[in-house]
Amino acid sequence: MSTVAEALAYKVADISLAEWGRKEIEIAEKEMPGLMALRKKYAGQKPLKGARIAGSLHMTIQTAVLIETLVDLGANVRWASCNIFSTQDHAAAAIAQAGVPVFAWKGETLDEYWWCTRQILEFDGGLGPNLIVDDGGDATLMIILGHKIENDPKMLDKTPGNAEEKALYQQLREVFAEDNQRWHKVAADMKGVSEETTTGVHRLYQMMEKGELLFPAINVNDSVTKSKFDNLYGCRESLADGIKRATDVMIAGKVTVVLGYGDVGKGCAHSMRSYGARVIVTEIDPICALQAAMEGFEVATMEDAVHEGNIFVTTTGNKDVITLEHMKQMRDEAIVCNIGHFDNEIQVDKLNNDPTVKIINIKPQVDKYIFPNGNCMYLLAEGRLVNLGCATGHPSFVMSNSFTNQTLAQIELWQKEYAVDVYRLPKALDEEVARLHLEQIGVRLTRLTPEQAEYIGVSADGPYKPEHYRY
């Protein structure tokens, strides 16, 4: 039986934090010229009028500026965080007080997390979203998996593989009991999703290959002004912030092992070296390994590096990169953290369920593990994103790049009709995003003469590089 109900207004930790949140949002706006330029450009046009946007993305001060930009452009928005530890409670309170339904607080349980994700997919009048802003793909996953369950209800009888899957299936079980065609109706109304991060993009391509993707998707992550800025320069600053706030450790003189040398790994390795650490990189890709070596980093296997490192950082987006056996072999007082999207890069479940290991909570998001040999290890943010779990994430300026791309992607999906596939934003928009951020940092561009433009075969107004160009 289908029922129509009014959607919940909001659920946050403490609405009285709204004034503090608003003050920080106003500061962030000054550091986010891309988003503010879009507000000015589209003032009065409301290019997202009629759009119902479900946002599953870290509920931070910077995200608040994105949310209010989407609202300014005409959208009806509901929001949740995409990580149980990443919400800044004062940011959530400010957005809730401004009238946007937000369901997020720092330190959610997995059951609460998936409940919050469900709330953003339930608009007034029993409607679902017609657009999604996703980070990691959980909102998209809930719709896709719910749709599959409606086709094959026996899926609800499966034994969950872990606590996260158990919590997700519980929400889907409740939805199915209320309306066994809910997700078919939601999917039919969807115009698309824009995905923020590498992990979520991998999910989208996998769904597309399997024929499971139900609506168009724009891969925001691989826009140059996202991956080469947010992933690289953002991590270069926020990793150290998270480690230091959590531990107060001196990085200089330490050995830091960075697992993975993609854009995120590059930012992390350079960050740690800039603080005076000796950095060892582990890699599976010969190209990335060669890049790391050419930058002067030692490249080794984890089996060799595990005995040397004082600090370990996973950046791969893969699972079981640091195993329980690795952790048992580490030096005394090692610090272990992750800056990839999910918590399965480190075998946290195995660690927590090992009866020979003693666990002592030091403070929120900092846990001490004592092994049978007497050595101890500190795990930050329970193996989830250290920069958001133990600090406040990337700086506003670099997030303006990413979120300007997200806003443009939402406009693109709303105003045009796309076939089901995974797309990227055109290079002209990528260049425009960069251009919007130049004045703020005092950059003046050289302009091609007509003769120069003709000589290299481009327009004087861009795009300046072919699609295959690697920045």
Curated annotation (Swiss-Prot):
Function: May play a key role in the regulation of the intracellular concentration of adenosylhomocysteine.
Enzyme class, broadest EC rank: hydrolase
A molecular function GO annotation: adenosylhomocysteinase activity
Residues holding substrate: T60, D135, E196, K226, D230
Name of protein: Adenosylhomocysteinase
GO cellular component: cytosol
Cofactor(s) listed: NAD(+)
Lineage: superkingdom: Bacteria
Family designation: Belongs to the adenosylhomocysteinase family.
Keywords for the protein's UniProt record, in alphabetical order: Cytoplasm, Hydrolase, NAD, One-carbon metabolism
The enzyme's E.C. designation: 3.13.2.1
Pfam families: AdoHcyase, AdoHcyase_NAD
Keyword Transcription regulation tagged: no
Cofactor remark: Binds 1 NAD(+) per subunit.
Annotated residues for binding of NAD(+): 197-199, 231, 260-265, 283, 318, 339-341, 387
Catalytic function, reaction form: S-adenosyl-L-homocysteine + H2O = L-homocysteine + adenosine
Principal location listed in the UniProt entry: cytoplasm
GO BP terms in the entry: L-homocysteine biosynthetic process; one-carbon metabolic process; S-adenosylmethionine cycle
Protein location: Cytoplasm
Pathway this chain belongs to: Amino-acid biosynthesis; L-homocysteine biosynthesis; L-homocysteine from S-adenosyl-L-homocysteine: step 1/1
Source organism of the structure: Chlorobium chlorochromatii (strain CaD3)
Record HAMAP family: AdoHcyase
Matching SUPFAM superfamilies: Formate/glycerate dehydrogenase catalytic domain-like, NAD(P)-binding Rossmann-fold domains
